[in-house]
């Protein structure tokens, strides 16, 4: 039981870390809001994005 809970916690933490990746092509520098980010990954424009501590991150998907 403990092992299962530990494995689930590790998987949850890894998925949370991998959910965001820095967008190196973001045109907004020093973004303040979600709308300031422009994501251009995988040939798509304007996917869901997030601004964390002034850096633009695109959500996978």
From Swiss-Prot:
Expressed by the venom gland. Disulfide bonds join 31-51, 37-56, 39-58. The keyword Heme does not apply. It is found in: Secreted. Keywords: Disulfide bond, Ion channel impairing toxin, Neurotoxin, Secreted, Signal, Toxin. Its main location: secreted. One of its GO terms (molecular function) is ion channel regulator activity. Residues 1-19 form the signal peptide. One of its GO terms (cellular component) is extracellular region. This is Putative neurotoxin-D.
């Amino acid at each position: 039981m403990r092992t299962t809970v530990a494995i689930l916690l590790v998987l949850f933490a890894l998925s949370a870390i991998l959910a965001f990746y820095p967008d190196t092509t973001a045109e907004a520098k020093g973004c303040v809001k979600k709308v300031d980010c422009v994501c251009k990954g995988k040939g798509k424009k304007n996917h869901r994005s997030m601004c964390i501590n002034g850096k633009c991150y695109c959500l996978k998907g």
